Amino acid sequence: MARMADSKLVAAAPRPGRVAGSFRDPSGQVFHFQDRILRTMDSAAAIEFASAERVMRQLVDEGRLVDFSDAEPSLHQLFQGSIARVLQHPLLEQITYPYEWSFAGLKAAALFHLQLQLDLLDQGFCLSDATAYNVQFEGSRPTFIDHLSIKPYRDGQLWYGHKQFCEQFLVPLLLRSVFDITHHSWYRGNLEGVPSADFVKLLSTRHWFSHKLFMHIILPAKLQSSRTSQTKVDLGDSRARRLPKDAFRAMLAQLYSWISGLKVDVGKQSVWQGYAANNTYTATQRSDKGQYVAEFVAQHKPRTIIDLGCNTGDFSYVALENGAEKAIGFDFDPHALDAAFDRSVQTSKNFLPLYLDARNPSPSQGWGERERQGFSSRFSADAVLALAFEHHLAIAHNVPLAEVVAWVTQVAPKGIIEFVPKEDETVRRMLAGREDIFSDYNEEAFASALSQKARVVNKHLIPGSKRTLYTFERSE
């Protein structure tokens, strides 16, 4: 009777929706169903999965792989075709993409991927690809999400994911480490990383004498270019080639060592480098703002909080220390984000700093304009902090003040927005040397715009300044 009841409930439930980015592997696809993720497998995929199940369970126990279990048999009827097995996974709260990660975050993901490959290889398995999209973060801790890419290792097989690893991990890291160019816009524009062929065009002659650069990037790019230009390609040679297991392991270990040593030039001045220490606040004013945030979080107890303009994460940490379980910070300054990520690693707090240019947030894009979801589709929270944030859009980038307020209040149902008036030294610097065209930028206009989108619960003037903190609760 219980099984019959389950079947009736399943029949009445909405059908699972395929995750838009899950279309490349026909042997197993991913679906969103109610409060969980379902993963289907055909018979071949189910056999391979069963052979690796013990290893995968070990990875789950180590926190390196998203948990899995078999879905109840009644759920099989939701899918058409020859489905041999259906897994269920916990629903990840947020999905992030490599073009939103900091240099430090991308580096952590690359090292995580390589270590996973090495450990799998020791147990007779390997990863079938090397896409960065298979890594997600819980705080600053990376985890792997694609169970079906763990395959039995075949003796002598080539590393078919080498090019993908280089373009989705190594080249974006080198772009910053060698040229001090951030990867975010390039990666987002291409989606599959930064092409090696494009990166090679940036290299000078001296770079060609680097053995690692030549072997992993320059030579493969040149060979690829040569193959593409041929009218006839002989695939037999590549299929006959063998890569001994020791050589495979040595290649992974070399990449691990190389990437571990990649650094950015912290001596170069960034837009907000040292901002926390050199802004227009006094220590007393900063402490006052922190106390206000602490009281807000203690009162409302948001599980997840979003910190817009997080810099190195000071106020995210205030939130975490006063009852928030998880903080996601956003900023566009690469040095601040790297410092914030390193801080998260060192403290083991559930804080993930991500890249965001609020003028141009990550859009929905890729195949069907749905393969990778946009910012607003993926990021929402119980509360939002927008401290010293709105004037960077309204003054520095001419976004209408009312639209800035509307955008911030969509991120969470409650939060704190700081209004920074024209009399503030920071805004005066922004307006220096340019015409002040912002006749409607004032606190009255700000308060009016906020009251149209939310209820103003409280406001607090930071002592010794003209900045005001507004606590809001959105009108539903």
Swiss-Prot record:
InterPro entries: RNA_MeTrfase_FtsJ_dom, SAM-dependent_MTases_sf. Keywords: Nodulation, Plasmid. GO terms for molecular function: methyltransferase activity. SUPFAM superfamilies: S-adenosyl-L-methionine-dependent methyltransferases. One of its GO terms (biological process) is methylation. It comes from the Bacteria. Not known; does not seem to participate in nod factor synthesis but required for nodulation on some specific Medicago species such as M.littoralis. This is Nodulation protein NoeA. It comes from Rhizobium meliloti (strain 1021) (Ensifer meliloti). The lineage of its organism: Bacteria, Pseudomonadati, Pseudomonadota, Alphaproteobacteria, Hyphomicrobiales.
